[in-house]
């Protein structure tokens, strides 16, 4: 018999971050933890840290979103796109993902979790630049900020925002992207730290406005 998959216990902070959506978040996390490695969505080391490193890390971005249409680039397993859609039913999401098996997983979870605010588009970001006029765009662990700018800005309306999850090198990535920031007319570029005092691993976001 295969060894049972051990999923990290739900952190106490999860309930306050998801509010009345916590049951949906629990179901998604259970599904991803039990089936994610088999489907090639997460690695074998992830279930024991699934809540803290992935789900909580993603949901901390939810307060930065505003009602409208948000695109998530390279959604993969649904991080952060599905997690944010669970936490913010008042926001519409389009999850943009090129890999067929990941798209199948996302579509299955959208139906299973009854997420009426989510659509899934199988494509690369650069292939759908003319299709969308997003209010905001998110991405997590996709590429360096300088490379993400030309992929994401064409999807966003004037006055819209990039809300891109980054690691501890966020400030350096912003410095390295100075040419792209000017070329693509980004303003109010800032690094925001989320979760201080709530979680052990904070979430860093680069936020910028498309002028």
Swiss-Prot record:
Assign the protein's first listed, main location to one coarse class. Answer: cytoplasm
Q: Which top class of enzyme applies to this chain?
A: transferase
GO terms for molecular function, please? rRNA (guanine-N7-)-methyltransferase activity
| Pfam families reported for this sequence | GidB
Compartment(s)? Cytoplasm
Family membership: Belongs to the methyltransferase superfamily. RNA methyltransferase RsmG family.
Query: Per its record, how is this protein called by name?
Result: Ribosomal RNA small subunit methyltransferase G
The scientific name of the source species is Clavibacter michiganensis subsp. michiganensis (strain NCPPB 382)
